[in-house]
Amino acid sequence: MQGGDHGGMEMGVGSFTGGGGGGECSSSSATAAAAAAAAAAAAAAEAEERQLLKGEIAVHPLCEQLVAAHVGCLRVATPIDHLPLIDAQLAQSSGLLHSYAAHHRPFLSPHDKQELDSFLAQYMMLLCSFREQLQQHVRVHAVEAVMACREIEQSLQDLTGATLEEGTGATMSEDEDETAPMLEGPMDMGSDGHDLMGFGPLMPTDSERSLMERVRQELKIELKQGFKSRIEDVREEILRKRRAGKLPGDTTTILKQWWQQHSKWPYPTEDDKAKLVEETGLQLKQINNWFINQRKRNWHNNSQTSTLKSKRKR
């Protein structure tokens, strides 16, 4: 009996202990499941909020300018032959923005909208400033790289007599062909276009040439824009002087009539000039200038006529 009672007690304790462990396991599983569900709900809410915020940005008035500012930064140091890739991505982004805008649902408070406006405006200013810094960086360092490349080419030519030409590699004169084997050893080029001494390609690659051409075009545009206002001012000044120096047709008719009447001695006296001032309404300086120019024109025509007459006599 005692053995049976002892065995039964052990079984009872075992049963009590086992029952308690099952309750703890189910409680832990429920807590973990609740935490996972809460995390999933929070992630879903955050994802939905991000989608709604993307829709707010897509319909914002500054959205197109922001995209243009981003693309402007990308275009600064992108080789010309790679620019179509940016255009293709830009076309895709346009469709994406339209999809965001199609699912737009206002959810921001007036205060949040003001904060979004301020953030986007500051972000666009940052991108514009960054683009200017990139342009300055590319211009300065591209010019330095080109100058350094020219110095290396000149040093190589001074040392070896080799002249680097685009597309043909190093060329030598016929007298130096015999020394070519000595140069092939240390100056041999690898299959990837880099020399084995570790100096890299001596001639600029297509991307480098494209970048150099881009920098040259940007500098040209910048110079034209810098001097544009000055050129327009000079042009306007020239046109103004031309308009100011051109006399009305009726006044020149009166002056020409006087000229034809006094063609033998086309030098008006002060009284003649005063009368012409009264008849034409011009200033004395304008009349003096017209007679000076008219005498020059007439002298030029007379000289041509006399030259033709002398040739005919011969």
From Swiss-Prot:
A molecular-function term among this protein's GO annotations: transcription cis-regulatory region binding
Limits of the ELK domain: 218-238
InterPro entries: ELK_dom (IPR005539), HD (IPR001356), Homeodomain-like_sf (IPR009057), KN_HD (IPR008422), KNOX1 (IPR005540), KNOX2 (IPR005541), TALE_homeobox (IPR050224)
UniProt xrefs under Pfam families: Homeobox_KN (PF05920), KNOX1 (PF03790), KNOX2 (PF03791)
CDD domains (UniProt xref): homeodomain
DNA-binding region: 239-302
Tissue expression profile of the protein: Isoform 1 is expressed in roots and flowers, and at lower levels in leaf blades and leaf sheaths. Isoform 2 is expressed in roots and flowers.
Protein's name in the database: Homeobox protein knotted-1-like 3
Source organism of the structure: Oryza sativa subsp. japonica (Rice)
